[in-house]
A protein has these predicted regions:
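Long, well-ordered alpha-helical scaffolding segments within enzyme catalytic domains
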Residues: 29-39, 103-118, 155-183
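Catalytic-core regions of hydrolytic enzymes
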Residues: 2-93, 98-99
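Solvent-exposed loop/turn segments at secondary-structure junctions
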Residues: 10-12, 50-54, 77-83, 100-103, ...
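Beta-loop motif signature
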Residues: 188-233
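Active-site-adjacent mobile loop/cap segments within catalytic or ligand-binding domains
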Residues: 4-6, 15, 65-67, 72-81, ...
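Surface-exposed patches in mature extracellular/periplasmic domains of secreted proteins
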Residues: 44-50, 121-127, 182-186
């Protein structure tokens, strides 16, 4: 199986910024760490981290062919909590799929696994964000992960202490839900196939089958965040 990981923002766009970090930097860190674990189960590619996939999608100049992948995960950090002093509780983690996705087993497992490390689970939501919309339009299941809130002291305290564990949790959640086996295929090889004959009984792993479309996103960042995140919903500019 081939999986594409995309770090949100970059190429001059820092994303959300607070005293605890810059989104564009943390998304690059996360995709690289997720790849370290996930590469034991599948071929994992990174969208060029010096580029901005959202800007590329809007300009019609994406650096990859989504059709070459079995799953696409775009990584971001959320904002809007404006809890810079900390209130003793996290605002949490959430993940988005397009409105066309039929099942969300992979995404449910991802946020459950992150939440188990100390975050509130904000669940799986459906919004057509630009990059994942383009991936789904190419027939590929996709999701946009908001790891945690970059302007929440409690969130970022947990994240800073457990960032490598969070990345591993995301990778293992994907591998588990797709039924991937460690070392089962070499990088660049095709997933193992099995002939299905008439009358055969086929079991499909929950969460491993999808169908739909995807899009972009846009949201205003509070005063606590110095620069505005950019990714409008499909068909909008923000």
């Amino acid at each position: 199986m081939k999986i594409l990981l995309i770090s949100g923002h970059g190429a001059g766009d820092p994303g959300a910024v607070s005293q605890f970090g810059k989104e564009a930097d943390e998304t690059i860190y996360m995709v690289k760490e997720i790849k370290k674990t996930l590469s034991a189960y599948a071929q994992v590619d990174l969208y060029p981290t010096e580029r901005n996939a959202y800007k590329d999608a809007k300009a019609g100049k994406l650096a990859v062919d989504f059709g070459n992948y079995g799953y696409v995960l775009e990584v971001h950090f959320n904002s809007g909590a404006a809890d810079l002093k900390g209130n003793g509780r996290t605002t949490g983690t959430e993940i988005y799929v397009t409105t066309a996705e039929k099942t969300v087993g992979v995404e449910t497992k991802i946020v459950q696994s992150i939440a188990a490390l100390g975050f509130k689970n904000r669940g799986v939501k459906k919004t057509n964000f630009t990059v994942i919309y383009r991936a789904k339009a190419a027939g590929v299941s996709s999701a946009l992960l908001e790891v945690c809130f970059i302007d929440d002291k409690d969130d970022m305290s947990v994240y800073t202490a457990k960032k490598t564990q969070i990345a591993a949790a995301v990778a293992n959640a994907i591998a588990t839900q797709f039924g991937l086996k460690k070392g089962s295929q070499e990088a660049g090889s095709s997933p193992a196939t099995q002939e299905i004959k008439a009358g055969s009984i086929v079991t499909i792993k929950s969460g491993a089958v999808y169908g739909g479309l995807s899009s972009t996103r846009g949201k205003a960042v509070p005063a606590a965040v110095r620069r505005q995140k950019t990714h409008g919903r499909q068909g909008t500019d923000k």
